[in-house]
């Protein structure tokens, strides 16, 4: 079983992440993690924080000379801005005199609509939103991306599974139908909004610029693709073992994600059955080989991978920190007020794709190891190859 946890606050000294259950023999380095974290910072519409903050990666355990050992892998992502926040966010008590007059320490008493602020204050009994927003912040996703790097490496090295994400909608701009190839990732990352279609990309940039001019924010839709999944990952036996249920749960756990769909998703609900499902057809050659004529299901049927590309989309809401804040209530007075204005992005949809890749990778790694077992990359690869050779229908 692959398990993972993160710890740390947005303006704390560091984020800490641990993943347990990955086999020995995965080739992954701190440079690989740093490269993935750099991808997370991509995208037109990111805020000023992306220009001066740096993710400093340190591997604490689970690897030796760039190869996993089979034990828990632990990563620290240090916050380069920590010296500015050392007193305000100190884990240990601080003399009140040292905090006096610090603007960063001013209580945040006007919760933002759409954010965790108010519900978090109510739940944990805080009279200040700072403790809530520090942990609820999407900064935490840097730790998930770090762990997802190891999971991606396993999927690629053991099973030949390749992941990529691309932005399919921002505001009213949406790409035409079509899937990018696994080799398109570099070109997608080079695009200012991580969109595979240049014409749509230009409209997305214009949407972001218009929102910024209006002191507003934008959400959008990201699609994640996994190529090379063998059939049979997941199970139909119980709901919590269905792969799509497991993926949906983790993807909905990403900050600001409000919806998940597989394949054609909600569009399928408006179709007749005769044009909603993927017909199965024979493939020429040796053995009883089959394929789906289409991939409307998104590579998952009955909670299991079909062997077709896994295709899942996530909907990200507009960021709730606005430079022209919405109406709220000041919790200290109970009077109407405008919400606090925290430094933020106009649009973080391109970055959301990198985060969703990481979470899909962790879930697929768990499902693959559940299916094939193995304490090393070589063993689980051998088990997968044996399974594929043994399939009566494949």
Swiss-Prot record:
Q: What are the entry keywords? A: Amino-acid biosynthesis, Aromatic amino acid biosynthesis, FAD, Flavoprotein, FMN, Lyase, NADP
Q: What does this protein do?
A: This reaction introduces a second double bond into the aromatic ring system.
Task: Name the chain's protein.
Answer: Chorismate synthase
Note the InterPro entries from the entry.
Answer: Chorismate_synth (IPR000453), Chorismate_synth_AroC_sf (IPR035904), Chorismate_synthase_CS (IPR020541)
Q: How does it assemble?
A: Homotetramer.
Provide the top EC class. Answer: lyase
Binding residue positions for FMN: 135-137, 255-256, 302, 317-321, 343
Name the NCBIfam families for this protein.
aroC, PRK05382.1
Presence of keyword Ribosomal protein: no
The entry lists its GO molecular-function terms as:
chorismate synthase activity; FMN binding
- Name any cofactors this protein relies on: FMNH2
Cofactor binding note: Reduced FMN (FMNH(2)).
Question: Organism source for this protein?
Answer: Frankia alni (strain DSM 45986 / CECT 9034 / ACN14a)
| Pfam families, A to Z | Chorismate_synt
Question: According to the UniProt entry, what is the EC number of this protein?
Answer: 4.2.3.5
**SS bonds (residue pairs):** none
Q: In which pathway does it act?
A: Metabolic intermediate biosynthesis; chorismate biosynthesis; chorismate from D-erythrose 4-phosphate and phosphoenolpyruvate: step 7/7
Biological process annotations from GO:
amino acid biosynthetic process; aromatic amino acid family biosynthetic process; chorismate biosynthetic process
Q: Which GO terms describe its cellular component?
A: cytosol
Catalytic function, reaction form: 5-O-(1-carboxyvinyl)-3-phosphoshikimate = chorismate + phosphate
Chain positions recorded as NADP(+) binding sites: 40, 46
Q: What gene codes for this chain?
A: aroC
Q: Which Gene3D superfamilies match?
A: Chorismate synthase AroC (3.60.150.10)
Provide the family line: Belongs to the chorismate synthase family.
């Amino acid at each position: 079983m692959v398990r993972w946890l993160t710890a740390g606050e947005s303006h704390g000294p560091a984020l800490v992440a641990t993943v347990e259950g990955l086999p020995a023999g995965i080739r992954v380095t701190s440079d690989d993690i740093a490269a993935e974290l750099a991808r997370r910072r991509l995208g037109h519409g990111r805020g000023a924080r992306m220009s001066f903050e740096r993710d400093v990666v340190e591997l604490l355990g689970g690897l030796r000379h760039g190869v996993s050992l089979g034990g828990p892998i632990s990563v620290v992502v240090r916050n380069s801005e920590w010296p500015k926040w050392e007193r305000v966010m100190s884990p240990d008590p601080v003399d009140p005199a040292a905090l006096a007059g610090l603007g960063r320490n001013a209580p945040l008493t006007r919760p933002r609509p759409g954010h965790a602020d108010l519900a978090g204050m109510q739940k944990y009994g805080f009279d200040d939103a700072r403790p809530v927003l520090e942990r609820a912040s999407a900064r935490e996703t840097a730790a998930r991306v770090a762990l997802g790097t190891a999971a991606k490496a396993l999927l690629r090295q053991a099973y030949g599974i390749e992941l990529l994400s691309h932005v399919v909608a921002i505001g009213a701009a949406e790409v035409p139908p079509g899937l990018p190839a696994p080799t398109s990732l570099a070109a997608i990352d080079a695009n200012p909004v991580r969109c595979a279609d240049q014409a749509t990309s230009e409209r997305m940039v214009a949407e972001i610029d218009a929102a910024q001019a209006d002191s507003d924010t934008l959400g959008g839709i990201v699609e994640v693709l996994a190529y090379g999944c063998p059939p049979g990952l997941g199970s139909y036996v119980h709901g919590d073992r269905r792969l799509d249920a497991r993926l949906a749960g983790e993807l909905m756990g990403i900050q600001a994600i409000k919806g998940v769909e597989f394949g054609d998703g909600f569009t399928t609900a408006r179709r007749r059955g005769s044009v909603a499902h993927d017909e199965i057809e024979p493939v020429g050659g040796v053995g009883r080989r089959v394929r789906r004529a289409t991939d409307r299901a998104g590579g998952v049927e009955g909670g299991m991978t079909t062997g077709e590309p896994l295709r899942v989309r996530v909907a990200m809401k507009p960021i709730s920190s606005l430079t022209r804040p919405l109406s709220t209530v000041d919790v200290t007075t109970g009077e109407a007020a405008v919400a606090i204005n925290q430094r933020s992005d106009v649009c973080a949809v391109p970055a959301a794709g990198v985060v969703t890749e990481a979470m899909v990778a962790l879930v697929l790694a768990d499902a693959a190891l559940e299916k094939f077992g193995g304490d090393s990359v070589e063993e689980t690869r051998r088990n997968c190859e044996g399974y594929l050779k043994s399939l009566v229908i494949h």
